[in-house]
């Protein structure tokens, strides 16, 4: 599992990805610079399910029906004929650009989604950008 950390003077955000769109694994008081992110991530998520077969999961920045999310999707797309597009994004890259930019792609549907996190004092600003190789209709796109 990949992990990246962003810090302000008072707080730390740890972003992680297990192969799909990244998610917030930790957002709380500032961690020490010596904190072992791998060990911290291994302690999450805790099993609150009472031993059932379903495991606890993080909700990523933009949950989709295409990746098996059963709740309200973070993105609703249709092709030019009104047919649902069920994206299944895979994590591609993370870059430091005025904060962090995370890129995920759905090659099959020709989609790319970028999640940018920038720091302004003690405020984390989240921005989502969707790109498509072909015309699509966006019925909804939620930013984290």
Regions found by a protein language model. Give the residues of each.
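Acidic (Asp/Glu-rich), glycine- and aromatic
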Residues: 3-7, 16-20, 30, 109-111, ...
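Hydrophobic beta/alpha structural segments that scaffold and line small-molecule/cofactor pockets
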Residues: 13
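Substrate/cofactor-recognition hotspot
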Residues: 23
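Acidic, aromatic-enriched beta-alpha/helix-loop junctions
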Residues: 27-52
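N-terminal trafficking/processing presequences and adjacent post-cleavage segments
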Residues: 45-48, 56-65
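Extended, loop-rich substrate-binding clefts of extracytoplasmic carbohydrate-active enzymes
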Residues: 60-123
């Amino acid at each position: 599992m990949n992990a990246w950390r962003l810090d302000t003077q008072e707080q730390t955000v740890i972003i992680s990805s297990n192969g799909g769109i990244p998610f917030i694994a930790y957002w709380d008081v500032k961690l020490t610079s010596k904190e072992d992110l791998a060990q911290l991530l291994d302690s999450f998520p805790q099993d609150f399910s009472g031993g059932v077969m379903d495991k606890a999961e993080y909700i990523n920045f933009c949950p989709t029906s295409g990746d098996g999310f059963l709740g309200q999707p973070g993105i609703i797309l249709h092709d030019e004929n009104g047919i649902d597009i069920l994206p299944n994004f895979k994590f591609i890259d993370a870059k430091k650009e005025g904060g962090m930019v995370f890129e995920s792609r759905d090659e099959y549907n020709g989609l790319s989604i970028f999640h940018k996190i920038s720091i302004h004092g003690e405020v984390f600003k989240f921005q989502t950008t969707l790109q498509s190789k072909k015309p699509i209709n966006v019925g909804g796109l939620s930013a984290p």
